[in-house]
């Protein structure tokens, strides 16, 4: 991570590659103009990639074990170009109910009107996924773990079943996985049979909550379709954002390991608090998904869910949130700062919903001193009960 994506042709002597603000690129000869690499490894036109995006893609590919990667303008654009690359009118896509809600709504509200059949499935469907696959299925979309509820797919099982059923039907099904929570530091999906990994690099890659960025990591078979989808839709990542993403990667391991440690301590403390019904965090030994997490991941993200002991009214929640000293309220996560927000299940969620009837919170552990974070939570939960 420290030295990937630092080719001399990009750096020109600088330690970090300066942002290249350019749309038009000048060729030195007709031969150079005619002969540039058609897999877009060269700097030929701003929308096709800059030295900053090329370096970021190179570094991420090395870290994730990908053949090539594609940098995009956000995590949602990464999902868009991937889905659009493999789905056409009349095709069927299976989407986990545990997906990031804007991703699920992208499938239902954007792709479905174009004639794509969208079907959701429980994140713990297991062998039951075989019955959902049909000749028109072209994509299976996973997220590990689930957003909000943090179930863990049995990825090995799902991949095996999809491949077997696809072979029986004589079809080609692309398996896509959103790997934002663990990142390539703690999980490498392509090594587990996944075809395409999508990453909201806005989160841990950038790491400082100051840039929007997405990355799609591809196998050799999936790369050209994904890259073409980005080109046809005019989706690319800016040089400044790629600069910040590449800079963030240099310290990502140190940040994520410390945040993981903080999250584990916070999860353990919350699990013993009387105001908390359940902590949704697979790395914790008390999680019902701990064994699957241990089988799949080498570490964990610092995002978790919290189910409180009852449904709290708005004024009580205001007592909790409005006076937190370290935990801030804000969308997104993955930066150095700790965040705490009230949340709810996805609009399309239908499985196990009764388990989440009480007030549901989402917590992101940052880099602050963990004792200070726990003290902030202790005071906040006391205010919640007193309100």
Regions found by a protein language model. Name each.
Residues 108-109, 117-119, 138, 160, ...:
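PLP-dependent enzyme catalytic core of the Aspartate aminotransferase-like
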Residues 278-361, 365:
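Conserved C-terminal alpha-helix-loop-beta "cap" of PLP-dependent enzymes
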Residues 6-8, 21-27, 181-183, 203, ...:
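Glycine-rich beta-alpha junction loops
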Residues 3-10, 68-275, 280, 291:
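Conserved PLP-enzyme active-site core in the AAT-like
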Residues 1-37, 386-387:
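N-terminal glycine-rich, Lys/His-bearing helix-loop that initiates the first secondary-structure elements
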Residues 26-30, 223-224, 311-315, 347-348, ...:
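Short, acidic Gly/Pro/Ser/Thr-rich loop/turn segments
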